[in-house]
C-alpha cells in the first residue's frame, strides 16, 4: 500500500494554555509548518496556533 498523503497534526496554542485543535494537512503540498489564527476558549481570544506532532 502507498503512504497516505494526508496526515493528522495538532495545532497548539501559543498562549500557553495547553488548548489544541486536531486537523489534517496534505504533506505533499504543504511541506512547511502550519500556523493559523483561531479562537482559544481558555484565553477567551483569538491567538496563533502552531503545528506540532501528535504523540
UniProtKB/Swiss-Prot annotation:
Gene3D superfamilies: Ribosomal protein L33 (2.20.28.120). Pfam families: Ribosomal_L33. One of its GO terms (cellular component) is cytosolic large ribosomal subunit. One of its GO terms (molecular function) is structural constituent of ribosome. Keywords: Ribonucleoprotein, Ribosomal protein. GO terms for biological process: translation. PANTHER family: 54S RIBOSOMAL PROTEIN L39, MITOCHONDRIAL, LARGE RIBOSOMAL SUBUNIT PROTEIN BL33M. Belongs to the bacterial ribosomal protein bL33 family. This is Large ribosomal subunit protein bL33. It comes from Allorhizobium ampelinum (strain ATCC BAA-846 / DSM 112012 / S4) (Agrobacterium vitis (strain S4)). The gene is rpmG.
Amino acid at each position: 500500500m502507498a503512504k497516505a498523503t494526508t496526515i493528522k497534526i495538532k495545532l497548539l496554542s501559543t498562549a500557553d494554555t495547553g488548548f489544541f485543535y486536531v486537523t489534517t494537512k496534505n504533506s505533499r503540498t504543504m511541506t512547511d509548518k502550519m500556523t493559523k489564527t483561531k479562537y482559544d476558549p481558555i484565553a477567551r481570544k483569538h491567538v496563533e496556533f502552531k503545528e506540532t506532532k501528535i504523540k
